[in-house]
Amino acid sequence: MNEAPQLAARRLAAGALREGYKPQALHKYTDTDGTPLHWRIRLKNHDTGDKWIRPMKLNGDGYVLGEPDYPEGKPLYRLRDLAAQPDDPVIVCEGEWCADALAKAGALATTSGAADSAGKTDWRALAGRRVILWPDNDEAGQRYADAVAAILLALGCTVFIVDVAVLVDVAVLVDVEV
C-alpha cells in the first residue's frame, strides 16, 4: 500500500469533510522507536463547534478506521518522546491536541487520547515518574484525572493535579495562549 497517511485520512473522513468539517490534525501514535502504530484523525466543524475524531490503522488491505488490538492496553501518545526523556516530569492531558500544544511550548506531554480512555491504556511507560495531570475543566476532566491518578499512584508515580477551576475561564488547555 503506497497511500500516505494524510491521503488515507482525507479519504476516510470524506463524508465528514463534505458536511463542513475541516482538518485540524493527524496525530501519529508510535512505539518508543518512532515506528507508527496508529493515527487519530481530528476534524472540526467551525460553524457548529463539533469535533470529529477517529482512529485510523494500517492493516493488510490499507488504511482503515479503527485502532489495532492492544492486548496490554493502548499506547500513550508521544511515546518516543517519553522514552527519550526518562527523567523529565511528564504532563498528562486529555487529548492529543493539548499534548501537542504543550510540546510546542517545550513541555514533555502525553495523553491516553480521551477522557474515557484511562482504563484502556498501558501507563507503564510512566512508572516511577513525576507526573502532572492537567485535566479539561469539566466533569469528565475531573473523572479522568481521578482515574489516571489512581493508576499512576499504583505504578509508583509522584502525581500532581492542576486545579483548572482556579485558572482564568478556560475550558481546555489549548484555549490558553501558550
Model regions and ranges:
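TOPRIM fold recognition
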Residues: 23, 28, 32-37, 46-52, ...
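Glycine- and charge-rich intrinsically disordered segments
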Residues: 1-7, 172-177
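Aromatic- and Gly/Pro-rich amphipathic surface segment
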Residues: 50-80
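A short acidic-Thr-Gly-centered motif at the start of a beta-strand
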Residues: 17-20, 74-86
